[in-house]
Amino acid sequence: MTSVGPEGVSSCPHPLGAALRAHYIYRKEAVVLTKLEVLGLRSLVPTLPLNEEGDAGNDPIQILGINGLGPVKANITTAPFGAFDGEALSGMSVPKRNIVLTIGLHPDWAVQTIEELRQLLYNYFMPKLLVQLRFHSTNFPVVTIEGYVESMEPNIFVKSPTIEISIICPSPDFVAMSPAVITGISNDGSDTTDFEYIGSVQTGFYLKVEKAVETSGEGSIQILLSGEYAPQSFSARGTLDDNVRFEMNTVPGQKYVRSVDNTLGTITNYLNDISYDAIWPTLYPGVNRLAIITTVAGQNWELSYYPRFGGL
């Protein structure tokens, strides 16, 4: 089993010429957020690092607070029974996330002004702009979330000016920047590959199976996944050949089952060959036990996924 960890992200200089930094350390039960990076997704806007290095009192941009990092309140819908007390669950979902940044401005008066810092932040946080936030912490990998700026409200005519920025994130989860990768060999289901999923909410994955020993070509490929939850079983047909690999994706909104020619890039779709009782497998927090079953055992497989977190 191999795992690919998150890579460090280098900081870019800002248009005023010096590194633009700000402190923010959030402590809760030994979990420490050490750095926030803001990426403007418009062209020509560099990364804006807001970090813990150096003296917070000397940083021109300082994060005074961040709200909206905890788990988002779920929408639980129920319907009343007609003949007896109580209600029946009819659905549940987690809506958008609203992150609110409170930022203080403390320019180096020899080279900067309050207005210059405020105009710099406008490049990132003008309402309707899409931004990406990257959070660094002591207990999590580097995670990212994207959202749209709802509002940016500067408090201009005060002695210590601040700016409050509201960001709406349609997808509420924080997602690891780098994937975890696990490899193994297919078998008859008698052996499993056990690994721990560190995320706090379930996630889909990408699976690739390639020929390693002689096989008949098209055949059955089955995924068995279990752990601290109900077992999941998924069975479909796929082709394994010297130049053809099997792929599937179980991420909601991106699902597919197919075989791909490594040379020509042609794709054979197998969505219509999924078993009627198949459950699209997802990883749950905790230990997951995975078995990949092929018509002829001994084929190479690789599974990759991005851990997801419902709160920091």
Model-derived features: positions:
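SsDNA-processing nucleotidyl-transfer enzymes
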Residues: P71-G91
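Oligomerization/assembly interface segments of phage tail-like spikes and tubes
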Residues: F84-W109, K159-D173, N288
